[in-house]
Amino acid sequence: STREAILLALAGRSVEQRKLTHCYQIANHMKDIYADDVWLEVAPADKLVPFLESGLAAAVADRPRDPPAWDRLTPAADPDITAVNAAFALGLVERHDLVDDDHRIYDLAHAAAQDAPEIDVTAFTRRFRNLARDPDDSEYRKALVDVTRAYATGGERAAD
């Protein structure tokens, strides 16, 4: 299960609640990629790219203006998960060759990356783009453990 994989990835580590919440969002991104692998074989992607682009644009525009504080007093997009969301969008569109290299989504992802320098957007894009197609349960769990560790702890890969 997703919960078990996340717990395995974070065993023995102390992780902020917001990061833990983000790990579940990242797991949903992985599931979305697999669902889109099937969906995009039978349906056009003409609405998917604008949807991803508008969501990313809204999150980049909604980022906090001040340096991050322990307790945010006003709602705003979290720059860390916005950067991972940007990587998800890029990974998905690159996985299915949906946009050209000069598409606006790359500019938005660059802006998101600048707002969260501790998040390696390029590495997360690669992780999402290169997820195994039609993985078995073990492959999926290992990929989820790896991406969870990479996000929450900047950490190591899962053992085979």
Regions found by a protein language model. Give the residues of each.
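Post-HEXXH active-site segment of zinc metalloproteases
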Residues: S1-H29
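An active-site-proximal "capping" alpha-helix that borders the catalytic cofactor pocket
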Residues: Y24-A45
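Pan-zinc metallopeptidase signature
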Residues: P44-D160
